[in-house]
């Protein structure tokens, strides 16, 4: 089996695990375990907390002491055990702590999977800019397959979804043992204090361009959290209108939302072209504009024929909004940093997006939703327009604040030699 195909299998399983429970665990906790909304919010907050703490630390470990593929294997082994136990938990406080441990083991694997992929591609003499996006496509496919499998097997309200995730984690942990060895960075004769402490990636903040990049990564991470948290409740709220109570949107909101992940597959494949043709600045600007459209279409969408088309368009542009930021950003970090701190830098990127950004996004977006709610009834149109305005504001500031001169040949050369 070629290295590209082996990495595709890894990517598929990586996101299959997440797709097995991420979308449906909330419904299981509310409907089966009878947790309150606050309980569910507390459990899901574990993702942001873990993402702040763990990816950078695990990246440093993978750079300095433990081979990346071994760190990856150990993390998924922990996830397998924790998810298996989580299936038997019925207390909300215990569920928070159990899922926090799971998140602390799982969140670093996102960055580690990127680092392992880039290193394996480099060892094989392949161009990461061209070879990585098709590999990542299989991650999205894995997420969709898991989500639909749980839905079609009617396990949305069952603890069996956690057993499925546990089994997939155990399988991926074993599979990681078959991956090529990723060498730990050689220690230099003269090292800085930051290097001795394993804080190399944090030195990137001394570079104004990288500092601005990570700042916007955090702010766009907040945008991603908005749609993760409030997309499904928004669609469910159409049930308040008798005209839409029996509509497809109300009955199968998760299936409609899964179109967003499907759109990712197509947009991922366009990343090599857009990155080489236009560069990271234009690609990230396109992402911010896509987020503006995502929220704008939500503002005017509903289950009517015309409104459904707008909702569907919102799902489609999500593919561009998500991929052109997350995947392109990861490739940009890969190209801009020294290979000795690659895993640390990828971990820092994930920390800013899924940690700080997710935490800030949860708090501020929740405040915005409450502000535009009266007696429990949410003014969704105004809420989505506010979020659209935020995304558009980011695009304008990024256009003037991020300095980047695109050189297609330089990008190609650096991608091959890293």
Where are these predicted regions, by residue range?
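Cytoplasmic helix-loop-helix junction between adjacent transmembrane helices
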Residues: 100-138
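Hydrophobic core of transmembrane alpha-helices in multi-pass small-molecule transporters
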Residues: 12, 82, 92-112, 116, ...
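Helix-loop boundary and gating motifs at the non-cytosolic
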Residues: 1-48, 209-245, 252, 326
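Multi-pass alpha-helical transporter architecture, strongest
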Residues: 6, 85-89, 169-181, 355, ...
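Cytoplasmic membrane-interface "Motif A"-like loop-to-helix N-cap segments
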Residues: 63-76, 276-288
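A membrane-interface helix-boundary motif in multi-pass transporters
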Residues: 152-168, 367-391
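C-terminal ends and interior cores of transmembrane alpha-helices
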Residues: 77-91, 289-304
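Juxtamembrane intracellular "pre-TM" segments in multi-pass secondary transporters
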Residues: 1, 180-215, 240-245
């Amino acid at each position: 089996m070629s290295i590209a195909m082996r990495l595709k299998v890894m990517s598929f399983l990586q996101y299959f695990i997440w797709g097995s429970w991420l979308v449906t665990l909330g419904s299981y906790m509310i409907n089966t375990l009878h947790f309150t909304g606050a309980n569910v919010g507390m459990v899901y907050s574990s993702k942001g907390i873990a993402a702040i703490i763990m990816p950078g630390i695990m990246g440093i470990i993978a750079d300095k002491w433990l081979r990346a593929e071994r760190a990856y294997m150990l993390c998924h082994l922990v996830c397998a055990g924790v998810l298996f136990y989580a299936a038997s938990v019925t207390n909300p406080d215990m569920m928070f702590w159990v899922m926090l441990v799971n998140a602390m083991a799982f969140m670093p694997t996102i960055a580690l999977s990127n680092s392992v992929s880039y290193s394996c591609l480099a060892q094989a003499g392949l161009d990461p800019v061209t070879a990585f996006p098709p590999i990542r496509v299989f991650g999205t496919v894995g997420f969709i397959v898991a989500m639909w499998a749980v839905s079609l097997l009617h396990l949305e309200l069952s603890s069996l979804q956690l057993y499925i995730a546990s089994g997939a984690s155990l399988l991926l942990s074993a599979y990681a043992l078959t991956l090529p060895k990723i060498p730990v960075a050689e220690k230099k004769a003269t090292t800085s204090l930051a290097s001795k402490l394993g804080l190399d990636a944090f030195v990137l903040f001394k570079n104004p361009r990288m500092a601005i990049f990570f700042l916007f990564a955090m702010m766009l991470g907040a945008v991603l959290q908005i749609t993760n948290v409030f997309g499904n409740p928004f669609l469910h709220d159409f049930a308040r209108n008798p005209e839409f109570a029996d509509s497809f949107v109300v009955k199968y909101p998760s299936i409609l939302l899964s179109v967003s992940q499907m759109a990712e597959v197509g947009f991922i494949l366009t990343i090599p072209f857009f990155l080489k043709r236009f560069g990271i600045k234009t690609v990230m600007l396109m992402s911010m504009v896509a987020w503006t459209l995502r929220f704008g279409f939500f503002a005017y969408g509903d289950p009517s024929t015309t409104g459904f088309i707008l909702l569907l368009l919102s799902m489609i542009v999500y593919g561009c909004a998500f991929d052109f930021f997350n995947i392109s950003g990861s490739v940009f970090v890969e190209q801009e940093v020294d290979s000795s701190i690659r895993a640390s830098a990828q971990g820092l990127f994930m920390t800013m997006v899924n940690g700080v950004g997710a935490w800030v996004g949860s708090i501020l977006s929740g405040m915005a939703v409450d502000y535009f709610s009266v007696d429990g009834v949410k003014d969704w149109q105004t809420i989505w327009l506010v979020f659209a305005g935020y995304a558009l504001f980011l695009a304008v500031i990024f256009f003037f604040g991020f300095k980047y001169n695109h050189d297609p040949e330089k990008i190609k050369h650096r991608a091959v030699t890293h």
